[in-house]
Swiss-Prot record:
Alphabetic keyword roster: Cytoplasm, Methylation, Protein biosynthesis
Origin superkingdom: Bacteria
GO CC annotation terms, alphabetical: cytoplasm
Protein name (Swiss-Prot/TrEMBL): Peptide chain release factor 2
PANTHER family referenced in this protein's UniProt entry, alphabetically: CLASS I PEPTIDE CHAIN RELEASE FACTOR, PEPTIDE CHAIN RELEASE FACTOR 2
PROSITE patterns: RF_PROK_I (PS00745)
Family the entry assigns: Belongs to the prokaryotic/mitochondrial release factor family.
Length: 371
């Protein structure tokens, strides 16, 4: 085998060994065994919330272990592919060598993607995520853009078999949405999606302009970790104002004949949360409380960071505005303004193919935090 190929394979094997050590593969196997025992308990589904959490954790752990084991097998198989190519002659040898090179390149990409997972070591990175999208400047185009972003993230979650729970959708009058809040129920969803927080900018020919002029639209993405009992985010009833109303759909149409939608106002902070996608008022209140607790946790941590930055004499860093630009006209390009990562296929990106942006964002964040 070519010495350069041998060196490449050895480097990939070493990187994968590091990944296996950081992920604690033996500990992962033990965790799967315990979760399987818990999942087999016939009484588990008496607590729906707990059952869903256990099955979700089990599925994620099994998928993670399978990915690592498959990568290890591919690393071990790669020298065999090159040996088989060396035994061929003429065009067959050339084709077999090209196939081995293609597998080497793909394996490098897949191992690097797995390596990114080891960078998610923040305090809340392993949590599930609550995502809120709000339309910004740009009128009806901005509302449509916010809905396109919502679809992008939901498609990404579906491609990874991550359950999504939509808490609230506030529809705009003509098209699109004013805002939406949904949860992505998967381990490390927060650590992964938190790099998406910021302002997303769309440039395109407006489908709502009868003169077909180019329009720039903005939408803001907020990503919060799901609150757990260990976070001690208590909200006294005296701090809440609860309003109920009828759920509404596109164009302001009522989609429910009862006052099942809930609006919670946290009086001390003025934070307002709404939920209307559940079937009952009680379910909507519970879901709204989960989002409110996530927002209060984020506020608490933000205040702690601000105090620490003041002590350091550091203004702190922010994701800032326009963290990513999506251009559909006059050319086609999606570019992250922090990482410089870019893709010339906006259709694929808007259909949920954002792993490259997520991986680049996570690496960028870790480099920034190390500085």
């Amino acid at each position: 085998m070519d010495p350069d190929r041998q060196a490449d394979i050895a480097a990939l094997a070493a990187t994968l060994t590091t990944v296996e050590r950081v992920l604690d593969v033996d500990g992962l196997r033990d965790r799967i065994q315990k979760l399987e025992q818990e999942a087999s308990d016939p009484n588990l589904w008496d607590d729906q919330s707990r059952a869903q959490k256990v099955t979700s954790e089990l599925s994620h752990a099994q998928n993670e272990l399978r990915r690592v084991e498959e990568l290890r097998q591919r690393v071990e198989d790669l020298p065999v592919l090159y040996e088989m190519a060396a035994e061929e002659e003429g065009q067959d040898a050339e084709n077999a060598g090209a196939e081995a090179d293609a597998e080497l390149a793909k394996l490098r990409v897949d191992i690097e993607a797995m390596e990114v997972r080891t960078l998610l070591s923040g305090e809340y990175d392993e949590r599930e995520a609550v995502v809120t999208i709000r339309s910004g400047a740009g009128g009806v185009d901005a509302a449509d853009w916010a809905e396109m972003l919502m679809r992008m993230y939901i498609r990404w979650a579906e491609q990874h078999d991550y359950p999504v729970e939509v808490f609230d959708t506030s529809y705009a009058e003509e098209a699109g949405i004013k805002s939406a809040t949904f949860a992505v129920h998967a381990p490390y969803a927060y650590g992964t999606l938190s790099v998406e927080q910021g302002t997303h900018r769309l440039v395109r020919i407006s489908p709502f302009d009868n003169q077909s002029r180019r329009q720039t639209s903005f939408a803001d993405v907020e990503v919060l970790p799901v609150v757990e009992t260990t976070d001690h985010i208590d909200v006294p009833e005296t701090d809440l104002r609860v309003d109920v109303y009828r759920s509404s759909g596109p164009g302001g149409q009522s989609v429910n004949t009862t006052d099942s939608a809930v609006r919670l106002t946290h009086i001390p902070t003025g934070i307002v949360v709404t939920c209307q996608n559940e079937k009952s008022q009680l379910q909507n209140k519970v879901a709204a409380m989960r989002v409110l607790q996530a927002k209060l946790l984020a506020r608490k941590k933000q205040e702690e960071r601000a105090a620490l930055d003041a002590l350091k004499g550091d203004g702190g860093s922010s994701w800032g505005n326009q963290m990513r630009s999506y251009v559909l006209h006059p050319y086609q390009m999606v570019k992250d303004l922090r990482t410089e990562y870019e893709v010339g296929n906006p259709s694929a990106v808007l259909d949920g193919d954002i792993d490259g942006f997520l991986e680049a964002g996570i690496r960028w964040r870790n480099r920034r935090d190390d500085d």
